[in-house]
């Protein structure tokens, strides 16, 4: 149960909150509409559907039913689909607008968070493969992967959201 709970804290709580910040900040900072509203819905709901089953990929070497291990491996690899849907949508929204991103410190943080999101999810899908996991699971690779997700993606994106929204709330600019 720990892996379902612990893994889903990141995937079903921190990830949607981080993506909500990105979906809010990037279109406003670039003064451009979201590239595709339909893709945002597909990305969100496919994330919710696929992510709920991946906690068992940390238990491939223990006596857990094979069907559960198989579902977790398939869904872990399938996470590439919702992640790329979300990132393509966000990155196409800011396409040609990097000057506006560069001018806003909050948007820079959020864009950096989306890059970390790409890396942590590609890494996670790869780490769920049994042949890779036999090598990486009982070392600090897994700890580093968790830190990239929580600090690299969720933390950097949250800081970007704060940097973006605080001047709007207070009416005063932030100086860096």
Residue ranges: model-predicted function:
Residues 1-3, 64-75, 137-143:
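Non-cytosolic membrane-interface motifs at loop->transmembrane helix junctions
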Residues 4-29, 38-59, 72-93, 107-130, ...:
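Hydrophobic cores of alpha-helical transmembrane segments in multi-pass integral membrane proteins
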Residues 102:
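Cation-handling catalytic/transport regions enriched in His/Asp/Glu
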Residues 133-135:
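Juxtamembrane/interface segments of multi-pass membrane proteins
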């Amino acid at each position: 149960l720990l892996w379902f709970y612990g893994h889903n804290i990141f995937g079903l709580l921190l990830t949607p909150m981080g993506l909500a910040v990105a979906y809010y900040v990037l279109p406003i900072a670039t003064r451009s509409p979201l590239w595709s509203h339909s893709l945002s819905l597909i990305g969100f709901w496919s994330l919710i559907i696929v992510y709920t089953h991946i906690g068992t990929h940390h238990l491939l070497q223990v006596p857990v039913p094979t069907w559960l291990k198989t579902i977790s491996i398939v869904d872990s690899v399938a996470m590439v689909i919702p992640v790329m849907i979300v990132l393509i949508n966000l990155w196409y929204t800011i396409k040609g607008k990097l000057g506006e991103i560069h001018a806003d410190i909050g948007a820079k943080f959020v864009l950096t968070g989306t890059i970390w999101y790409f890396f942590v999810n590609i890494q996670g899908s790869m780490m769920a493969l049994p042949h890779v996991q036999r090598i990486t699971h009982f070392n600090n690779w897994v700890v580093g992967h968790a830190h990239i997700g929580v600090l690299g993606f969720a933390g950097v994106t949250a800081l970007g959201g704060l940097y973006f929204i605080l001047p709007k709330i207070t009416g005063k600019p932030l100086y860096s």
